[in-house]
């Protein structure tokens, strides 16, 4: 397991600004399965399927029946525009649905020019489009009417959002930050677990999932994420482990038989003490005849036991392949450098340690409690154990079979493993029948034992990817995403590192066979601001898992001890695009419940974005692959902590400014503001700068709206805030630090420091997002 405690292709993701597409159901937009008729402009990507488009079409023609022909001829286009904004990928913004403190609009937010034009030509249409009587009452006052229909965040008003490059250039793609880090989100699924080492499903149509704790308990969860109060399996009395952090012994793996629905058999992998020695044991259990959510503990049948010469490198993965055989992944026996025998256990075909084993649990032969698949690569070799499928393994921690592309089946059956390294490198391998993965001759791409490495008969397969210990020190293998809910992630191999807490990904280029590395970070700004989503996780990434539908999860903990209930299961979410409604519906088979249910209560919270403390960067060395195997190395990734940590903003001095403001003329108070503007603008317009802690700095425009502008304008002696300005419209304050970000004001505050914000100096933006205001002594509605 992991060590002791120390913290297609690129077309699918693009660099971009922090736009926030969201539908009225508070979920990401999608690509409809059929073209839309009324709202055809949203056929490629939006918030309506064919059913909703048909309903809007009915409303459109019902509206036509209530308007005379001449008016309809002039106004039909406006009617279509307004009705179809429910289908916009930014519908939640257009209708103020993303703000729980404001009522949902009945008419989308309009840009001033469009509203003025429509008011002059078709204002009578609004009485048929909206039941809002406040809007009706303003119909005779053009300025107040259009003010009422405006948005605080003018970036999202219709129709300007259609041509806003920042909102449209990355639409529907996973956005990567400036360093190429893919921005994803998480959903908490289970918590309070003691080192959750595995999450599996039974392939029986119930869509239950089972989470194993290192201490020796397995819990059953229903599709609604409630947990059964009675453990599915409890062998904690015989499992060998301890409370000390980093103990690699314990309950390590579980796999359900492919025909579990009919034979009720499952298999477990755990550490056990036998006559003062340490062993790994693979056993078969059967589910109770009386309770399908509980194992019959008396049914244990020991399949295989292997003596461990040390307490670490115990392996622990069990998998069934499409061939129906059970794959067992053992470690090399522990200690440093695989010191056992002339070549170590991993290179010794007569040893079961340091191997991938493959057995047939459905038959027995040669006096064994299992059979040997006839095509195992070393059957008939007197110097080899017939169970051996692959060798040269140090300590593969978490492996998975690729389900294959949902449409073409491409990739199905590939076996991915993360193999934990010694002193320098971690690696990801694709395991093949008879393959030699190099340990202890090689660690990653580099030689470890130079005499073995020079042996021409080694014929080892290099990893598809390796990274140095400046990036992470204990790889946790993951899965190729093949689920239904997030199409952009299809084909992406997602894995992590236990020690550094880094999430990572690999994507194969089908044309070249090369693997492209991308780090995964938690979404910035509003990326993860959807109900139920979070943007942080505990740093010790223990394992990954799939549910029955193919959605992807990982397990991590804040305290890597087998007795500490700090473990959490997270679902990986792409907030940029989802599958069309109805496509991914499941109908779980019924399960009889005989114990109490414990409802799931999430504990983790969304953390507003912050600037992360940078970690060391590194590049893994590469070598020319053998036998045509593709290689990849991380392009100097900058790690990010799992939980964002606050860092003070830059202290680059602002000094005195040329022009209108002289900051040295008097003492300033914290929270005081000033406007800096290009020549020719009125005194009420400019970039907002705020004084805090003896220095001036700028305000980032994330969450910046008219309420924040009102606070600034009132401080400066203006009666009215006309506009909240974004995107450094009044120039960039590049010589100053960014002091405030995600400022959320109600409008009554005395200064910006009294508004909600991320903390002084805590931000994740650049000066091209400097906020500004337009203030006035005159009421803009008159």
UniProtKB/Swiss-Prot annotation:
It is found in: Secreted. Disulfide bonds join 181-521, 185-528, 399-417, 484-584, 700-765, 713-775, 745-755. Residues 610-623 have a biased composition (Low complexity). The keyword Transferase does not apply. Transmembrane segments: none annotated. The keyword Nuclease does not apply. InterPro entries: 6-blade_b-propeller_TolB-like, Folate_rcpt-like, Glc/Sorbosone_DH, Quinoprot_gluc/sorb_DH_b-prop, SRCR, SRCR-like_dom_sf. Glycans are attached at residue 234. GO terms for biological process: artery development; cell migration; cell population proliferation; smoothened signaling pathway. Residues 604-666 are annotated as: Disordered. Residues 1-19 form the signal peptide. Its main location: secreted. Residues 632-642 have a biased composition (Pro residues). Keywords: Disulfide bond, Glycoprotein, Secreted, Signal. Residues 673-776 form the SRCR domain. GO terms for cellular component: extracellular region; membrane. Belongs to the HHIP family. PANTHER family: HEDGEHOG-INTERACTING PROTEIN (PTHR19328), HHIP-LIKE PROTEIN 1 (PTHR19328:SF32). This is HHIP-like protein 1. It comes from Homo sapiens. The gene is HHIPL1.
């Amino acid at each position: 397991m992991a060590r002791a405690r120390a913290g297609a292709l690129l077309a699918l993701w693009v660099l971009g600004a922090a736009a926030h597409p969201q539908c009225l159901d508070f979920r990401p937009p999608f690509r409809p399965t059929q073209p839309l008729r009324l709202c055809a402009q949203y056929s490629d990507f939006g918030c309506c399927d064919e059913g909703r488009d048909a309903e809007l079409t009915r409303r459109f023609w019902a509206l036509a029946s209530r308007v005379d022909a001449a008016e309809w001829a002039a106004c039909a286009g406006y009617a279509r525009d307004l009705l179809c904004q429910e289908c916009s990928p930014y519908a939640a913004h257009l209708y103020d649905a993303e703000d729980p403190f404001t009522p949902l609009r009945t008419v989308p937010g309009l840009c001033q020019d469009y509203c003025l034009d429509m008011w002059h030509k078709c204002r009578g249409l609004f009485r048929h489009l909206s039941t809002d009587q406040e809007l009706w009452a303003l119909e005779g006052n053009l300025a107040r009417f259009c003010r009422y229909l405006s948005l605080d965040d003018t970036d999202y008003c219709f129709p300007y959002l259609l041509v806003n490059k920042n909102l449209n250039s990355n639409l529907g793609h996973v956005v990567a930050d400036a360093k190429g880090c893919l921005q994803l989100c998480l959903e908490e699924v289970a918590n309070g677990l003691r080192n959750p080492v595995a999450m599996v499903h039974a392939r029986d149509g119930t869509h239950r999932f089972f989470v194993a704790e290192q201490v020796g308990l397995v819990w059953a969860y229903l599709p609604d994420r409630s947990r059964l109060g009675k453990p599915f399996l409890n062998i904690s009395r015989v499992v060998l482990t301890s409370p000390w952090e980093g103990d690699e012994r314990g309950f390590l793996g579980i796999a359900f038989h492919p025909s579990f629905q009919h034979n009720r058999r499952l298999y477990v992998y755990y550490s056990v003490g036998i006559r003062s020695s340490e062993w790994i044991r693979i056993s078969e259990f059967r589910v109770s005849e009386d309770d399908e959510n509980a194992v019959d503990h008396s049914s244990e049948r020991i399949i295989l036991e292997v003596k461990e010469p040390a307490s670490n490198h115990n392996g622990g993965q069990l998998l069934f392949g499409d061939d129906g055989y059970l794959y067992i992944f053992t470690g090399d026996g522990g200690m440093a450098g695989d010191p056992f025998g002339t070549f170590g256990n991993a290179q010794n075909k007569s040893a079961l340690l340091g191997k991938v084993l493959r057995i047939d649990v459905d038959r027995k032969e040669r006096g064994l409690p299992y059979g040997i698949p006839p095509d195992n690569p070393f059957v008939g070799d007197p110097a080899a154990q017939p169970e051996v499928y692959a060798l040269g393994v140090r300590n593969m921690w978490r492996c998975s079979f690729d389900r294959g592309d949902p449409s073409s089946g491409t990739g199905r059956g590939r076996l991915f493993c993360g193999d934990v390294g010694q002193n320098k490198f971690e690696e990801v391998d694709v395991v093949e029948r008879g393959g030699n993965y190099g340990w202890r001759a090689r660690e990653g791409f580099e030689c470890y034992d130079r005499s073995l490495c020079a042996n021409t008969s080694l014929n080892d397969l290099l990893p598809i990817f390796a990274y140095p210990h400046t990036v992470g020190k204990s790889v946790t293998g993951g899965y190729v995403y093949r689920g239904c809910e997030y199409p952009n992630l299809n084909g992406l191999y997602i894995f992590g590192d236990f020690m550094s807490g880094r999430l990572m990904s690999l994507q194969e280029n089908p044309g070249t066979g090369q693997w492209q590395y991308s780090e995964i970070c938690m979404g910035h700004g509003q990326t993860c601001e959807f109900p139920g989503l979070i943007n942080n996780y505990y740093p010790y990434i223990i394992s990954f898992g799939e549910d029955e539908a193919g959605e992807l999860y990982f397990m991590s903990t804040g305290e890597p001890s087998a007795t500490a209930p700090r473990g959490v299961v997270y679902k990986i979410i792409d907030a940029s695009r989802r599958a069309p409604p109805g496509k991914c519906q499941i109908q779980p088979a019924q399960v009889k419940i005989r114990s109490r249910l414990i409802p799931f209560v999430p504990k983790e919270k969304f953390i507003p974005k912050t600037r992360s403390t940078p970690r060391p960067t590194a590049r893994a060395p590469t070598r020319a692959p053998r036998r045509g195997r593709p290689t990849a190395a991380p392009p100097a990734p900058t790690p990010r902590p799992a939980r964002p940590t606050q860092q003070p903003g830059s202290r680059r001095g602002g000094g005195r400014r040329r022009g209108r403001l002289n900051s040295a003329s008097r003492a300033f108070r914290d929270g005081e503001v000033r406007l800096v503007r290009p020549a020719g603008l009125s005194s009420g317009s400019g970039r907002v700068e705020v004084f805090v802690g003896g220095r001036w700095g700028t305000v980032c425009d994330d969450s910046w709206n008219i309420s924040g502008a009102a606070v600034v304008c009132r401080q400066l002696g203006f009666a009215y805030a006309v506009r909240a300005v974004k995107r450094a419209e009044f120039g960039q304050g590049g010589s100053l630090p960014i002091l405030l970000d995600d400022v959320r004001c109600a409008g009554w505050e005395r200064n910006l420091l009294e508004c909600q914000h991320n903390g002084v100096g805590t931000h994740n933006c650049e000066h091209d997002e400097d906020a500004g205001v337009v203030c006035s002594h005159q009421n803009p509605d008159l």
